[in-house]
Design a protein with these regions (language model features):
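DNA polymerase sliding clamps and clamp-related checkpoint/processivity subunits
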Residues: 1-20, 25-150, 158-252
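Phosphate/anion-contacting hairpin/loop surfaces
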Residues: 155
Length: 252
């Protein structure tokens, strides 16, 4: 039996809309310490991972831990109906193959989402160390990716001691965007290397997917030479949402 009340229903909508850019269905784990999920896209280019601790909920009761297979189109259709002041109540009874979602404000609206059977194998999180870590404004990152998409199908992240660049070039032209702490777009910036430049390139389509996160207050950007990109978003309600994206195979 699972019963939980989350204070901001729309934050759940933002979370699962972002997850659905990478996967169509996911197994969500309800454990005594919180809610989590991790999945990889079909092309094995990107991984999504999120965690919501139990103390983020107004009430949280898990008598029996469970992994719930959810079709994201079905869940998002419901979560899109949340309004600004709605709380979200979640309930699951093992005898029923469904998740009950109720929006609670002046009136109570209750929806039932049927669950699906999914394998219980969760992909392991790679143990990666990064030479560059930056805390950035999420909207600025999203707009930078859109700017790069105007001229190219990939973006190169390049770190210098005092600035992070996102750039690209193609037969259509070139683009370069500079992020610094002085500009206000970087809240923190660390380069743990004495190399002159650290760079890696990533496909623009996936970058557009993993930077279109609504409601986030900050994003941590981590990368190394020709290594997977890690984006970790902090969403209100103590929700942590992370993406890993493989570098381009022909990255130089």
């Amino acid at each position: 039996m699972i019963e939980a009340v989350f204070p901001q229903a729309r934050e759940w909508g933002a979370l699962f809309t972002s997850v659905s850019k990478i996967v169509d269905e996911i197994s969500v784990s309800f454990k005594k310490e919180g809610v989590s999920a991790r999945a990889m896209d079909n092309a094995h280019l990107s991984m999504v991972d999120f965690y919501i601790p139990k103390n983020a909920f107004e009430t949280y009761t898990v008598i029996e831990e469970a992994n719930l297979g959810i079709k994201l189109d079905d869940l998002n259709s419901v979560l899109k109906r949340a309004t600004k002041n709605d709380k979200l109540r979640l309930s699951f009874d093992p005898s029923e193959n469904s998740l009950v979602l109720a929006f609670i404000s002046q009136i109570k609206r209750e929806f039932v989402v049927n669950l699906i059977e999914l394998g219980s194998n969760t992909p392991p999180m790679p143990n990666l160390s990064y030479e560059v870590t930056a805390i950035a404004d999420p909207t600025a990152l999203k707009e930078a990716v859109k700017d790069v998409g105007v001229v190219s199908d990939f973006a190169t992240f390049e770190a210098e001691p005092n600035a992070l660049y996102i750039k690209s070039k193609s037969s259509r032209g070139s683009v370069s965007l500079e992020f610094t702490k002085e500009s206000g777009y970087l809240l923190d910036y660390q380069v743990k290397s004495d190399k002159k430049k650290i760079r890696a390139s990533y496909g623009i389509k996936y970058l557009e997917y993993i930077t279109s996160v609504d409601e986030a207050v900050s994003v941590s950007i981590s990368f190394s030479n020709s290594a997977p990109l890690k984006l970790e978003y902090q969403i209100p309600g103590d929700i942590k949402l992370s993406f890993l994206l493989a570098p381009r195979a022909d990255d130089e």
